[in-house]
Amino acid sequence: MSTGTVVQVIGAVVDVEFPQDAVPQVYDALEIKSEDLVLEVQQQLGGGVVRTIAMGSSDGLRRGLEVVNSGSPISVPVGEKTLGRIMNVLGQPVDEAGEIGEEERYVIHREAPSYEDQSNTTELLETGIKVIDLVCPFAKGGKVGLFGGAGVGKTVNMMELINNIAKAHSGLSVFAGVGERTREGNDFYYEMEDSGVLDKVAMVYGQMNEPPGNRLRVALTGLTMAEKFRDEGKDVLFFVDNIYRYTLAGTEVSALLGRMPSAVGYQPTLAEEMGVLQERITSTKTGSITSVQAVYVPADDLTDPSPATTFAHLDATVVLSRNIASMGIYPAVDPLDSTSRQLDPLVVGQEHYDVANGVQTVLQRYKELKDIIAILGMDELSDEDKTTVSRARKIEKYLSQPFFVAEVFTGSPGKYVSLKDTIRGFKGILEGEYDNLPEQAFYMVGSIDEVVEKANKK
């Protein structure tokens, strides 16, 4: 355990000098005992000086303070004791419910599983959300991204997925709140408590008000806890909200360390940093990690380097659209932009594939006809096109669905729709079984039976 002294403090960056023969390694955790602060080594500057990033507030730090090298990277509690608890980036409890009392700790910087240890699966994970189950089905043990700009419903969608999957799921869940609002973390805790599944969830939070070093590492802390459960042979759900804040924290740290920025001001190591996190989120022959990640899209630009780098790592992408949200259709998932590797007849079956394809074809044709309708009106369309437009509008409305987590805001009870009912409903619309029903009957309902019931009431 070597000791050094603080020689320079610039915001969250702290330079520490050690004896030449005891210089800490990169990623080692250093502790300033008097300030109860942990630093992580980022660079060795030479002459025994290392440059570190503070994991907490650096207010009040001064030159000459004693710093102790722990000799290893940041380690966090893992295992059963973390369930039902809220922790920070260092694995310290922040829920005022006493010590974690862990039996084991893991370091947060770990190697990804080797290629031969990884397993692939084609088992589907039903979410109960029509548009997702139909157009971009999730795989058990896969990686899913929820892409969307500000205010189109990423967090609400994620909460609904947690509600539908985590509550019905017999395994364990880990939630990593990366650079998001404290209020959302609070809401999530009480949501889990009310539904009685708190003892199956471990929560790790590093909110918006935390320093960049904290936000950069909190995703790794959550992932380390999920990996432990996976290595014990369990099926784990890993939720991250929000991956963009992880990238942004990396950008801040990179700038603080004086690195030259690359495209759009991002860090030059963007792809590598994303890879370090994403390569570890994988299923092995022992257990599985199914991850759902919210990804903020700056200025609704999907070609921005941050979301574009994330796309490459995912099995399914759920793209939320501002245009669809402005039509009052929630969840505002864009069925033409969202994709899934699982949407293959060999995985989902021929019927599901054909119905999903049919829905996308009709919606795409409607999109093409919109300009003609705007200029010439509906009367100039052929009868076939008029039918297509009518069915497309019904499909658009039917893609909406009341959420359980939004009941308090909307006043309408949430609906869970099984995959079988979803396929049956859309197949019926495509085949013209419901051509005689009014368009409005398809809006904000669960299964197709409710549409018929709603239409008959009118």
Curated annotation (Swiss-Prot):
Record's catalysed reaction(s): ATP + H2O + 4 H(+)(in) = ADP + phosphate + 5 H(+)(out)
Entries under CDD domains matching the protein: ATP-synt_F1_beta_C, ATP-synt_F1_beta_N, F1-ATPase_beta_CD
SUPFAM superfamilies: C-terminal domain of alpha and beta subunits of F1 ATP synthase, N-terminal domain of alpha and beta subunits of F1 ATP synthase, P-loop containing nucleoside triphosphate hydrolases
Annotated keywords: ATP synthesis, ATP-binding, Cell inner membrane, Cell membrane, CF(1), Hydrogen ion transport, Ion transport, Membrane, Nucleotide-binding, Translocase, Transport
Chief place where the protein resides: membrane
SMART domains: AAA
Cross-referenced InterPro entries: AAA+_ATPase (IPR003593), ATP-synt_VA_C (IPR055190), ATP_synth_F1_bsu (IPR005722), ATPase_a/bsu_AS (IPR020003), ATPase_alpha/beta_chains (IPR050053), ATPase_F1/V1/A1_a/bsu_N (IPR004100), ATPase_F1/V1/A1_a/bsu_N_sf (IPR036121), ATPase_F1/V1/A1_a/bsu_nucl-bd (IPR000194)
Enzyme Commission no: 7.1.2.2
Binding site for ATP: 148-155
Top-level enzyme category: translocase
One GO MF term: ATP binding
TM ranges: none
Compartment(s) where it occurs, according to its Swiss-Prot or TrEMBL record: Cell inner membrane
Topology of this chain in the membrane: Peripheral membrane protein
PROSITE patterns tied to this protein: ATPASE_ALPHA_BETA (PS00152)
A Pfam family hit: ATP-synt_VA_C
Function: Produces ATP from ADP in the presence of a proton gradient across the membrane. The catalytic sites are hosted primarily by the beta subunits.
NCBIfam families recorded: atpD
Family as reported in the entry's similarity comment: Belongs to the ATPase alpha/beta chains family.
Alphabetized PANTHER family for the sequence: ATP SYNTHASE, ATP SYNTHASE SUBUNIT BETA, MITOCHONDRIAL
Assembly: F-type ATPases have 2 components, CF(1) - the catalytic core - and CF(0) - the membrane proton channel. CF(1) has five subunits: alpha(3), beta(3), gamma(1), delta(1), epsilon(1). CF(0) has three main subunits: a(1), b(2) and c(9-12). The alpha and beta chains form an alternating ring which encloses part of the gamma chain. CF(1) is attached to CF(0) by a central stalk formed by the gamma and epsilon chains, while a peripheral stalk is formed by the delta and b chains.
Protein name per its UniProtKB record: ATP synthase subunit beta
Originating organism: Shewanella woodyi (strain ATCC 51908 / MS32)
